[in-house]
Amino acid sequence: MINKIIFGYLILVTLVIADDYTSQRGMTNLLGVETNLRCSQQMSNPKAKTYELSYKRTASMPLSPFAGEYKPKFLPEIPWAGSRQVFTMDVLNENVNDGNQGTQMDALGHFGYTDEIWDGDGDADLSSLKYFGKLNGKEVKPTPESPLKKLGIESVPPIITTAVFLDVRKHIFNGKAMKAGEYVTVQHIEDTIKKSNVKDRGILPGDVVLINTGWSDNYQDPDDLGIYYTKAPGVSYNLVKYLSDKQVVGVGLDTWGVDTFAEEGEYGPERSQNPEGIANPAHHYFLTQSGVHTLENFNLKDLAKDSVDLSCVIILPLMTQGSSASPLRPVAIGVPTT
């Protein structure tokens, strides 16, 4: 009986959406009855616990280098020097870009790309700018100061689905945190699944995938050392395509960028997989090609401690019209196995 009540509630939550954004969505179009039912099975388990997946938002937490104002103000497209990529961002208050601070998710309109590499000098040529679904720059962001007219965070539905937690720190790196410049590979993920409680299930269409690298050991509040945002491990380009082929809805790490950031000489050999002219290959493929949302600064410590390899995750971005990202308070409901 409880399972039926929960199932009915989840269907109602999914259906109560004022506008039809299906044409602007990627993998979130897979959310529905099947993913709700999978979630209800986790939520109705009497041994299930609720886990906070966000960090407390404070003035002393690690701050993104992309901070800005906190009063609605929409910035022009921002080209990435040495890259064909262009990203969009809106700011709220001075020194605080709320959508890109703390635990957050990106809208599909957060990144676009051009035909030619911008060398960082002069104004970038945005005439070839494209976004997810091959939408051109003027369709998504008509003027430099405008909000996103398509692919904004308001187009993202409530994400209520099963989350597969993959602890590569535990199963691949013997409990040691990954280093900046290292990549999580397809082999790492496949080996982790074989060693985890989802070995018979694997990754299903509509899942969220959460990957624990251990980099969050550097997330300190107050952020006296200032290490966290300087660099990070991330996912390899082949893994990005692998997870996209699995038709996952979102991919989150305990890092600030999903992509890999490091000093020259620190990157692993998997860097050679990256396409030419793409500075942030995970953001590029997930957001502009496959329609998978990037989930950042997720607090996965409790899931790791309790080995919650499968859970129901609830991710509700703010419906800030025209914004390219949103702060989150995601939760997971699942059964501890340790």
Task: Label the predicted regions.
Residues M1-N3, T338:
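A positional/structural detector of protein chain ends, strongest at the extreme C-terminus
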Residues N3-A18:
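Cleavable N-terminal signal peptides of Sec/SRP-targeted secreted and luminal proteins
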Residues I17-T338:
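Active-/binding-site microenvironments in catalytic and ligand-binding cores
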